[in-house]
Each structure stands twice: as structure tokens, then as C-alpha cells.
Amino acid sequence: MAVGKGDGSSSNNGNDRGRGGYVDPRFKRLLWYLIASTRGGINRARILELVNSHPANANKIAQELKLDYKTIIHHLEVLSKNGLVITDNEDTYATYFLTPLMEKNYDSFVEILVKFGKK
């Protein structure tokens, strides 16, 4: 087994590297669980893609994805509790953004979508 160089690199041809370097395998498992292994994962993936392209409030997300507002709120709560999205405030019109951790690991998210057959 090869040992990394201490700079976040590893011996698996870069498969564990995100935008910002090393990808924590626990975070990757969390993404797999939330996107590929649970009911509602497709909608969570769609929300993450939308918020990555342009942060928005829950109402705007519901309109753009053509989903019920309460469904969006549920998925945003799941994503928020798991550290994937964050809001600028707790207001009704709060804008949702990807967390720095999710931004750093966005490539892993895309990889999961490709393997899951959704990209």
C-alpha cells in the first residue's frame, strides 16, 4: 500500500481529490447516501446543482425545479443538517448556498451523479 506525500495526495490516481485537494472518504459516503441511496436523492441532487449554479431562496428553487415548496424545504433541511448547504440568514426569504465543504467536494458529487446515471 502506497503512502501519501502528506500533501493530501494519494496513490489512487487522483480519485479522492476534490477542487481543493483531498476528499474525506466519510464525506463521499455521506454524498452517496444522500444522493444515491435514499428516496429523494434525485431532488437533493437537483437542488445542489441549482444552488451551485446560482444561490436562491426556497421559493425560487421550488419554482425552477417545479416541485412543491414543502418538498424543497424538507430537502433543504436534510442538506443543511448534513453540512451541504447554508443560508445567509434564518429569514423566510433566506438564500441558500453550498457550504465551503460542499464546494470543495463538488467534483465528488458530480462523480456520484455520473456513476448513478444522472449526469
Where are the regions that the model predicts?
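Short alpha-helical segments that sit at the start of domains
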Residues: 17-45
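Conserved segment of winged-helix/HTH DNA-binding domains
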Residues: 30-31, 95-119
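Short capping segments at the starts of secondary-structure elements
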Residues: 42, 53-57
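Hydrophobic residues on short alpha-helical segments
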Residues: 45-51
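A short acidic, leucine-rich amphipathic alpha-helix
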Residues: 60-64
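Short amphipathic alpha-helical interaction segments
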Residues: 67-78
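Glycine-centered, phosphate/nucleic-acid-interacting loop/turn motifs that mediate DNA/RNA or nucleotide
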Residues: 83
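Short, Lys/Arg-rich nucleic-acid/phosphate-binding segment
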Residues: 89-95
